[in-house]
Amino acid sequence: MSLGSMARALATFLILVLLHYTLRPLLGWRAPMDFLIHALLLASIRVRPAVGALIGLALGIVSDSLTPDSLGAGAIAMTVVGYLASWLKAVFFADNIALNAFFFFLGKWVFDLIYFIVEHRLGGIELVQQLLLWSPLSAAATAVAGVLLLFVMRPLLEPAKV
């Protein structure tokens, strides 16, 4: 990875983290899009699985620091998602919009499944409702936002023409 492509990837990562903490709270949706998952997935497909897991762990610890009730749940979930995204990059590393949307959807849904099961705040029918209704809706919103971000941020994500 060249210095220029590394700088563009870092800029994209920081923009997505900034959007997560500025734009997402303003929307206030019940099934919100998750820009941290976008940042994690886009960073993880560019590195080896262990580094993807470390990126996920770091993002998870940062996001969990804001919600001490569920400290560690986000770190575990993002570590698993970062590892799996990096491991599956050969399958999903295509310029196919539907495949990228499915990649974002699956990444967010797996994160939510792990997060809400490990968190232990919900139980019974509330957990089932969260995992089978609200999490897929949030994953769909994340996938739509991810595809739109791929179109908007294409100059930052493509390798430089030499």
Residue ranges and their predicted role:
Residues 1-162:
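Terminal, non-globular segments
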